[in-house]
């Protein structure tokens, strides 16, 4: 039986195993508090997130279960990895992940990025997305603050709010809206993995320009800014809009012509412009895939088809539609924690 110690962080009781020491708060979100800590077993610095009251409602219990299942499934060099998980005597859940030094948002607000860094960061983002998408998973919330980077420029997509949480002191925090694909923003249709390619394209453009590409004040303004660059959506896209109100809104807008990307991104490499144009396409069916983007000439310095893996199996979403009581989710969660430690022990033996 693991031994637990208690400590107060920001008025919150952290009840963690003796394996972790030197807790320091690094962020707080709606669902939990994150601290950096020293892992006594490995000597590494880690991030420890406490999930607040995971079993207080069926919705929270299901959300926590989903996040754990996803992190266990998505094992890849460019995705944040789960190194430990435990449930305290108070029945709070703690996720332990790698700790990386910074994130892309902080980098972008501190200095312009040189071309080789833009290429390398984009390559790693797309390499991670290729794996995520092959597992039948959509990130849905890709943005610079969800992309963690260490001193070696290794990049990891921080998925599902489980790793580093937004620093409350961070200035100039950018809304998720800036990176949201039009088909999500205007609820046109059932969206798919292409929404992540749009977000990655927005991040790519921001790395080139040093500022957000589509900084909308609200969804209407956001859409207007997008059309100023991409022009009016083509008819085959407008025809897919299910909402009558959204359809009326889009049809009421004045016709706009697409601005040539070479004109917008005057100092960008022609290959960068070509790839960006393939990522930022109104019609999700015509957006380039992560796998094809990796093979684009712009990423040739890093592209290695033998080292861009896909998932062994598609993620099992069968639990998603289950409407279960908290106690059932709790039993399922304990089972997942147990299987994680059994799997971890097998890997180490």
UniProtKB/Swiss-Prot annotation:
Disruption phenotype: Sensitive to methyl methanesulfonate (MMS, causes DNA breaks), hydroxyurea (HU, ribonucleotide reductase inhibitor), thiabendazole (TBZ), sirolimus (TORC1 inhibitor), and cold. Dually phosphorylated on Thr-171 and Tyr-173, which activates the enzyme. Phosphorylated by wis1 in response to osmotic stress, nutrient limitation, hydrogen peroxide and arsenite. Dephosphorylated by pyp1 and pyp2. It holds the Pfam family Pkinase. Its EC number is 2.7.11.24. Activated by the MAPK kinase wisl, and negatively regulated by pypl and pyp2 tyrosine phosphatases. The active site is at 141 (proton acceptor). It catalyses: L-seryl-[protein] + ATP = O-phospho-L-seryl-[protein] + ADP + H(+); L-threonyl-[protein] + ATP = O-phospho-L-threonyl-[protein] + ADP + H(+). PROSITE patterns: MAPK (PS01351), PROTEIN_KINASE_ATP (PS00107), PROTEIN_KINASE_DOM (PS50011), PROTEIN_KINASE_ST (PS00108). Keywords: Activator, ATP-binding, Cytoplasm, Kinase, Nucleotide-binding, Nucleus, Phosphoprotein, Serine/threonine-protein kinase, Transcription, Transcription regulation, Transferase. Disulfide bonds: none annotated. Belongs to the protein kinase superfamily. Ser/Thr protein kinase family. MAP kinase subfamily. HOG1 sub-subfamily. The TXY motif contains the threonine and tyrosine residues whose phosphorylation activates the MAP kinases. This is Mitogen-activated protein kinase sty1.
């Amino acid at each position: 039986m693991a031994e637990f110690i208690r400590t107060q962080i920001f008025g919150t009781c952290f009840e963690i195993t003796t394996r972790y020491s030197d807790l320091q708060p690094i962020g707080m979100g709606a669902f939990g508090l994150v601290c950096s800590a020293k892992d006594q077993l490995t000597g590494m610095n880690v991030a420890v997130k406490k999930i607040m009251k995971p079993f207080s409602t069926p919705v929270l219990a299901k959300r926590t279960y989903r996040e754990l299942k996803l992190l266990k499934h998505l094992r890849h060099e460019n995705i944040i990895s789960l190194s430990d998980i435990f449930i305290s005597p108070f029945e709070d859940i703690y996720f332990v992940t790698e700790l990386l030094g910074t994130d892309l948002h902080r980098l972008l607000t501190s200095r312009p990025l040189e071309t080789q860094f833009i290429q390398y960061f984009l390559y790693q983002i797309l390499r991670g997305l290729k794996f995520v998408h092959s597992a039948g998973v959509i990130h849905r919330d890709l943005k610079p603050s969800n992309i963690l980077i260490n001193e070696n420029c290794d990049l990891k997509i921080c998925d599902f709010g489980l790793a580093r949480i937004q620093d409350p002191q961070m200035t100039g925090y950018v809304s998720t809206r800036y990176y949201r694909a039009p088909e999500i923003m205007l609820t046109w249709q059932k969206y798919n993995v292409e929404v992540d390619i749009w977000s990655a394209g927005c991040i790519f453009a921001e790395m080139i320009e040093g500022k957000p590409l589509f900084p909308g004040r609200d969804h209407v303004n956001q859409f207007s800014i997008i059309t100023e660059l991409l022009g009016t959506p083509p008819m085959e896209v407008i025809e897919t809009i299910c909402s009558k109100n959204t359809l009326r809104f889009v049809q009421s807008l004045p016709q706009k012509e697409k601005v040539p990307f070479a004109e917008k991104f005057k100092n960008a490499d022609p290959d960068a412009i070509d790839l960006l144009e393939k990522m930022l396409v109104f019609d999700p069916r015509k957006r380039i895939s992560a796998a094809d983007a990796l093979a684009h000439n712009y990423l040739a310095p890093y592209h290695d088809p033998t080292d861009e893996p896909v998932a062994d199996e598609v993620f099992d979403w069968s639990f998603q539609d289950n409407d279960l009581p908290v106690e059932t989710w709790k039993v399922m969660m304990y089972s997942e924690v147990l299987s994680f430690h059994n799997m971890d022990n097998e890997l180490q033996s």
